[in-house]
Amino acid sequence: MVKKFQQPRAAAATAHPAATDAALRVIYSGGNAVDAAIAAQAVICVVMPDAAGLGGDVMQLVRMPDHRVEALTGSGRSPAVAPDRWLSQGGSSVTVPGIVDGWCTASARWGRLPLAASLAPAIEIARASRASSQLIAARDEQRARLAAHGASGWSLMSTQPGHWWHQPELADILTSIAADGREAFYAGAAAQAIVDATRHYGGSLSLDDLAQHSSEVADPVSIDWQDGALHVQPAPSQGIVLAMAAQWLTRSAIDPADREHALVEATEAAFQFRDFAGRPPGRMLSEALEIDLSVAQHRAGPRGYLHTAGVAVADSEGWVVSSLVSVFDDFGSAVLVPELGFVLNNRAAGFTSGDNAPRASARPVHTLAPAMLSVGDTALGLATPGADGQVQTILQVLSRLTTGTEGLQLAELDDAIARPRWRSQDGRLLIEGDHPDQLDLSVRGHRIETRRPGDPIFGAVVAAGTTGGAPFAAAAHRRGVTKEVR
């Protein structure tokens, strides 16, 4: 059950305790939830470089006190000159990093404090050093990839669990961004260092590619959901897949005994349209999902990528942010920019075929898909890592929050997030061993693959919102995510 607090001003749920603390500190320093979300995202870039970094992207939904919702797309395009070969790692997998311009855009459009105030906690952590987390240090299998792409001298490579990890280069570039904004990153010496790193390892990114980058702010894709609206990230995000599946559920009379099976089938049917996510949302939402609940269809749409980090923040003024930051795969492309202290994304690995085929100056369909639910004066932001698992996890949580005819049941938020989950992947149905519907789903023909309860493959939901003027937050027990209301 969501806990009640006396006149709280701020609520945050994030992928790391230091990020949650930074978000709340910024609000208590006079900022709003947007300033706080930037602070949390920046801290994650410092303490979780396997998941996110300055070489990656940000997607976020912002709900304003007047109840309007806008979407920020902070992702970049592939180079204007295509590489000789498109690979899933190395320089040719890198698209223009979008997160820094995303911060600058969000701060200028919705924030209250200077960007420097939001970046201060991350700079402090990077400058003073932070104990290496078990999560980072345990990724020994990534060391060979990193070493092959110039990271042998990166301080992280020699850091053991619990030891101090020094990041002066990262602190310096963050300090420059705090002082000079996007120009400190997309021009000059920093831009040249990014270009040099990608080209040394087979990429074709240019200074012009970086200079011409800009974030996009647009309306979200919205559908009716119970007595309110569900908002998802617009293209190039695959959030439309969530909207398509959710819309089918709202328009279908489903027997409660069939609901979990129906969720799986709706997810898999919607994922057949993933590569067309860039088409007009009205056209996508008018597509008929081919769903036959008589038997499992085993459609192989969702894939097995995992990483990313979530940030959800709300304040007592009515600002709510639901966001995700990512370098895509663990440590992205594995290409280190040594002068700046971060690795670059491998978002070009998201290209597939057809509308989403690899090409120059294009944004691949993007896995980051935060969501926002609006019902009257209540707003709820939801986000989770897990690539193609994101929309599946959010759909399951939403379904558990709005069963029956009682509308949104915020009292069930913690339980809805904590309950065992499944994940459709490559024609199989991965499922937590304590899921109550495991046997029923098997009988219906799903190819069950049981995983241990709490396996990180099932995501790590962060949630924050406001109701009746009071902010609240919730978080899953998976992957060490944290929440705090203050």
Each model region followed by its residue ranges:
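Active-site rim segments in enzyme catalytic domains, especially the processed small/beta chain
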Residues: V34, V46-G53, L61-R63, E70, ...
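Short beta-strand scaffold segments in enzyme catalytic cores
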Residues: A52-M64, A309-A314, P370-M372, F458-T467, ...
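Internal maturation/activation junctions in enzymes
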Residues: R251-S326, L340
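Extended C-terminal subregions enriched in glycine
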Residues: F276, P280-G282, E317, A362, ...
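Conserved catalytic alpha/beta cores of large enzymes that bind or transform nucleotide phosphates
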Residues: T352-R428
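Noncatalytic scaffold domains of N-terminal-nucleophile
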Residues: M1-G181, F185-A187, Q192-Q226, P234-S237, ...
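Short, small/polar residue-rich loop motifs at catalytic or cofactor-binding pockets
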Residues: V217, Y305-T308, D330, H366-L368
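Catalytic phosphate/nucleotide-handling subdomain of diverse soluble enzymes
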Residues: R182-A270, L336-V337, F342-V343, G350, ...
